[in-house]
């Protein structure tokens, strides 16, 4: 994953590595009953192990400094470096890895494609998927 605070290594450099998600953790060590109990304890909102790459362009259309946050395989929130207003960046990510976007100063929720959660989809005809970040409209 690029831009992760303190990481310094982009996904392009990590594309050949394999990360084991929770779905691979207990299969050999636990029996069926224990595995079901372990799965029940995992967060519902988390990344799932996917080998399908998705090219993404994250665009900050808000006047705020944006903090992108990736939910890892265990549901832990991992913040990345901030994105200035009017700027964008391109990343290679994996399909079904969820992202949230927050105001870097206030931690207010920001919308991405008019919803609170962004889950990359498959690229169609080789075109990147856009994640357009905007402010919430309060009625």
UniProtKB/Swiss-Prot annotation:
UniProt xrefs under CDD domains: pVHL
Beta-domain: annotated segments: 54-135
Disulphide bonds in the chain: none
InterPro entries attached to this UniProt entry: VHL_beta_dom, VHL_beta_dom_sf, VHL_sf, VHL_tumour_suppress_b/a_dom
Chain spans, region Disordered: 1-22
Family label: Belongs to the VHL family.
Pfam families: VHL
Gene3D superfamilies linked to this entry: von Hippel-Lindau disease tumour suppressor, beta domain
UniProt tissue specificity: Abundantly expressed in the placenta.
Source organism: Homo sapiens (Human)
Protein name, entry field: von Hippel-Lindau-like protein
């Amino acid at each position: 994953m690029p831009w992760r605070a303190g990481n310094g290594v982009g996904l392009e450099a990590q594309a050949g590595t394999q990360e084991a998600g929770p779905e691979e953790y207990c299969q050999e060590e636990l029996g069926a009953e224990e595995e079901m109990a372990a799965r029940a304890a995992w967060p519902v909102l988390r990344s799932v192990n996917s080998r399908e790459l998705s090219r993404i362009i994250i665009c900050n259309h808000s006047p705020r400094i944006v903090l992108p946050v990736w939910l890892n395989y265990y549901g832990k929130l991992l913040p990345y470096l901030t994105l200035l207003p009017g700027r964008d960046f391109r990343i290679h990510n994996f399909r079904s890895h969820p992202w949230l976007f927050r105001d870097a100063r206030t931690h207010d929720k920001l919308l991405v494609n008019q919803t609170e959660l962004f889950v990359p989809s498959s690229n169609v005809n080789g075109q990147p998927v856009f994640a357009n970040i905007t402010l919430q409209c309060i009625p």
